[in-house]
Amino acid sequence: MKNIIFMGPPGAGKGTQAKILCERLSIPQISTGDILREAVKNQTAMGIEAKRYMDAGDLVPDSVVIGIIKDRIREADCKNGFLLDGFPRTVEQAEALDTLLKNEGKSIDKAINLQVPDAELLKRLLGRAEIEGRADDNEVTIKNRLDNYNKKTLPLLDFYATRKKLSQVNGVGSLEEVTSLIQKELA
């Protein structure tokens, strides 16, 4: 079984690499944003609760997100593992996730962090903004997003490092080079 967490700053290539990895390992990619929207659409108990916060423009509390993740990992396609993308983002969320998984007889096998220098991230994100025509992705807002990410994520990296679950992977290189490095960490 492979229960994996994918971490990395905006522009590191998480989404692209997660998709490839999930196909190769035959495990589902669980994106918290996607499962929140799905739970709301399906009007599950947790989805109805999440909708109250989303409609008010508030962040969905960790307890609700954890409840939705709990429902998702109980689905049949997760029996051989899963890849969590975009969660946890804080140590508190990681602790709650560990408790949830322990209660389900599971645990995180590996937390993969894609490392990409800020200058490269800036280049990628500005390029992506140009292609997608996103006016909000200018140099100032991108640097702010990266600063926020770095402040919030460093304690999370320590959390998984102290548990001997963290693998730091160089996210600079060709698609195949980075994929190969990730697969070596999972072997």
Curated annotation (Swiss-Prot):
Q: Name one GO biological process term.
A: nucleoside diphosphate metabolic process
Instruction: Give the matching Pfam families.
Output: ADK
Q: Which pathway is recorded for this entry?
A: Purine metabolism; AMP biosynthesis via salvage pathway; AMP from ADP: step 1/1
Q: Which UniProt keywords apply?
A: ATP-binding, Cytoplasm, Kinase, Nucleotide biosynthesis, Nucleotide-binding, Transferase
Q: What is its EC number?
A: 2.7.4.3
The UniProt annotation puts the region (NMP) at: 31-60
Enzyme class comes to: transferase
List the SUPFAM superfamilies.
Answer: P-loop containing nucleoside triphosphate hydrolases (SSF52540)
The catalysed reaction is: AMP + ATP = 2 ADP
* Subcellular localization, as worded in the UniProt entry: Cytoplasm
Q: Where does AMP bind?
A: T32, R37, D58, L59, V60, G86, F87, P88, R89, Q93, R134, R145
Q: Gene3D superfamilies in the record, alphabetically?
A: P-loop containing nucleotide triphosphate hydrolases
What's the domain of life for this entry?
Bacteria
Q: Where is this region: LID?
A: 127-137
GO-annotated molecular function: adenylate kinase activity; ATP binding; nucleoside diphosphate kinase activity
Q: What InterPro entries does the annotation carry?
A: Adenyl_kin_sub, Adenylat/UMP-CMP_kin, Adenylat_kinase_CS, P-loop_NTPase
Q: What is known of its domains?
A: Consists of three domains, a large central CORE domain and two small peripheral domains, NMPbind and LID, which undergo movements during catalysis. The LID domain closes over the site of phosphoryl transfer upon ATP binding. Assembling and dissambling the active center during each catalytic cycle provides an effective means to prevent ATP hydrolysis.
Note the subunit structure. Monomer.
Cross-referenced NCBIfam families: adk (TIGR01351), PRK00279.1-3 (NF001381), PRK14527.1 (NF011100), PRK14528.1 (NF011101), PRK14531.1 (NF011104), PRK14532.1 (NF011105)
Known role: Catalyzes the reversible transfer of the terminal phosphate group between ATP and AMP. Plays an important role in cellular energy homeostasis and in adenine nucleotide metabolism.
The Swiss-Prot or TrEMBL record describes its family as follows: Belongs to the adenylate kinase family.
Q: What is this protein called?
A: Adenylate kinase
Organism encoding this protein = Leptospira interrogans serogroup Icterohaemorrhagiae serovar Lai (strain 56601)
Q: Which gene encodes it?
A: adk
